[in-house]
């Protein structure tokens, strides 16, 4: 490729990625030359500013027409821009959590934490704009490898080391399975470009090729199910969430999960809605596999909510809650239509606000008590009424109570499931039943906060970083719960 050709590309379309990459490089150099005894936490503010600028740059690119560069390996379209906004917002809020993370084994001398988190965020952004299997895989690995290191960054913690090891093993297996499925697609079509694959799979009318394509679909679904924590590939989630630092847990629960659904939607809708399925009506491979996806969604909702009932560790409880929410989103994928993409995006937006806000409060309480046990939430209303009300808002939204963004997200997916075909009525019923089950553990926390006496009588103050996260997330949860049209209008 000549220099003239390189200069002709519209590199300004990659401005957000360049900003995140440049910020990561600056932080790595600053960390290298800072004295060893210097507190590294102020680097979080530099990282936050970089991500905020990248977010503004992404908003500035919204009016731009869809364009692809680098031989269609990088594509900036409406899909990519919409999900990049979620990824950047989640990354920025996670960095604010990191600034005020103060356990005994904290991030005070871990400067690598901040640029590793930016590298993970960059990988997720590349996945959102990937137009080629190779680009997509590079982004996936950048996100995955950075996340493995972040999960075990507390090197002296045995729990963190154990969780990181489980994450590496499970993540490596899932990556191998995903790559194996991609290799089948490449073997059948002779190309790694996603658009070209979508055209080539339409020509696979031979039954033998269609069976191989179905195997590729299932292998990629299995591999990516690890990333989104769906049953039965969810086993790593509770241990990693509990062992990782709270900012990392929050990042994995929002940014990594969103990136997982980005790759699922980008690949499966583009490729497998065009692929024929032998002896099936309709003749799309994706639609012929909806029953399997629906089964995964139902099992994920049931198991996630059921096991969460017995948890005392708040991190493990939110881990199983995260699994259950993956099931709710999978309902939208099982009942797939073009309308459901908007519903999935809105659900991930709502989940970003309510989950990160809850993790900010959890971090403050667990840092003070040196434990994430549910009992430490007792009497929070007496110690900090505003913080208790904010946590109540997040819990109500996670439970799907009207007036919150979580309710709108669940309602849209529920109605979408009812509108597709009668077979999804069962899935919608499971969604309602498991949502009711979730009330038990969400309102169990609610009872601790408002109706149990506090062990500590001192006022609980919030550092500036955590306070910013709580305020922004509470406002977002209420605003999009009352006026959801703002988000949908912006998306359009």
Swiss-Prot record:
Q: Which InterPro entries match?
A: NADH-Q_OxRdtase_suN/2 (IPR010096), ND/Mrp_TM (IPR001750)
Q: Does the keyword Cell membrane apply?
A: yes
* Chief place of localization: membrane
Enzyme Commission numbers on file: 7.1.1.-
Topology of the protein relative to the lipid bilayer: Multi-pass membrane protein
Keyword vocabulary terms for this entry: Cell membrane, Membrane, NAD, Quinone, Translocase, Transmembrane, Transmembrane helix, Transport
Q: Which N-terminal stretch is annotated as signal sequence?
A: none
Top EC group: translocase
Which GO MF term does the entry hold, naming one?
NADH dehydrogenase (ubiquinone) activity
Q: Which parts of the chain span the membrane according to its record? A: 13-33, 42-62, 79-99, 111-131, 133-153, 168-188, 211-231, 251-271, 284-304, 318-340, 344-366, 388-408, 426-446, 463-483
Name the cystine pairs: none
**What does the record give as the reaction this protein catalyses?**
a quinone + NADH + 5 H(+)(in) = a quinol + NAD(+) + 4 H(+)(out)
General function of this protein: NDH-1 shuttles electrons from NADH, via FMN and iron-sulfur (Fe-S) centers, to quinones in the respiratory chain. The immediate electron acceptor for the enzyme in this species is believed to be a menaquinone. Couples the redox reaction to proton translocation (for every two electrons transferred, four hydrogen ions are translocated across the cytoplasmic membrane), and thus conserves the redox energy in a proton gradient.
Protein name stated in the entry: NADH-quinone oxidoreductase subunit N
């Amino acid at each position: 490729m000549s220099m003239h050709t390189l200069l002709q590309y519209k590199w300004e379309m990659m401005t957000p990625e360049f900003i995140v990459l440049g910020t990561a490089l600056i932080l790595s150099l600053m960390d290298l030359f800072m004295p060893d005894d210097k507190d590294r936490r102020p680097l979080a503010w530099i990282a936050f500013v970089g991500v905020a600028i990248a977010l503004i740059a992404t908003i500035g690119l919204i009016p731009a027409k869809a364009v692809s560069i680098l031989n269609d390996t990088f594509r900036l379209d409406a899909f990519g821009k919409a999900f990049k906004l979620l990824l950047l917002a989640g990354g920025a809020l996670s960095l604010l959590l990191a600034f005020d993370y103060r356990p005994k084994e904290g991030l005070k001398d871990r400067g690598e934490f901040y640029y590793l988190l930016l590298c993970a965020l960059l990988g997720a952004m590349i996945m959102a704009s990937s137009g080629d299997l190779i680009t997509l895989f590079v982004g996936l690995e950048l996100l995955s490898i950075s996340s493995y290191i972040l999960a075990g960054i507390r090197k002296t913690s045995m729990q963190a080391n154990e969780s990181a090891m489980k994450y590496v093993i499970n993540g490596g297996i899932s990556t191998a399975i995903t790559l194996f499925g991609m290799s089948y697609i490449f073997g059948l079509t002779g190309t790694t470009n996603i658009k070209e694959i979508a055209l080539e799979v339409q020509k696979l009318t031979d039954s033998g090729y269609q069976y191989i394509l179905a195997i590729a679909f299932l292998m990629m679904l299995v591999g990516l199910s690890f990333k989104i924590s769906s049953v039965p590939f969810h086993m790593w989630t509770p241990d990693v969430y509990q062992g990782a630092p709270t900012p990392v847990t929050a990042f994995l629960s929002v940014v990594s999960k969103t990136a997982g659904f980005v790759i699922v939607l980008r690949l499966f809708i583009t490729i497998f809605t065009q692929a024929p399925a032998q002896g099936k009506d309709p003749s799309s491979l994706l639609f012929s596999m909806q029953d399997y996806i629906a089964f995964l969604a139902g099992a994920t909702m049931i198991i996630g909510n059921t096991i969460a009932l017995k948890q005392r560790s708040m991190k493990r409880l939110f881990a199983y809650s995260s699994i259950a929410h993956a099931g709710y989103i999978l309902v939208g994928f099982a009942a797939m239509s073009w309308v459901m993409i908007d519903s999935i995006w809105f659900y991930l937006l709502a989940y970003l606000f309510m989950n990160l806000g809850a993790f900010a409060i959890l971090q403050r309480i667990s840092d003070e008590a040196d434990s994430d046990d549910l009992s430490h939430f007792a009497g929070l209303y007496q110690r900090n009424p505003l913080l208790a009300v904010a946590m109540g808002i997040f819990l109500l939204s996670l439970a799907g109570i009207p007036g919150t963004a979580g309710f709108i997200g669940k309602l849209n997916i529920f109605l979408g499931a009812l509108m597709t075909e009668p077979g999804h009525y069962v899935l919608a019923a499971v969604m309602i039943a498991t949502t009711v089950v979730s009330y038990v553990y969400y309102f169990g926390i609610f009872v601790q906060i408002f109706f149990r006496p506090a062990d500590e009588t001192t006022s609980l103050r919030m550092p500036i970083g955590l306070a910013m996260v709580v305020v922004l997330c509470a406002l977002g949860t209420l605003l999009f719960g009352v006026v959801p049209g703002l988000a949908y209008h912006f998306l359009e």
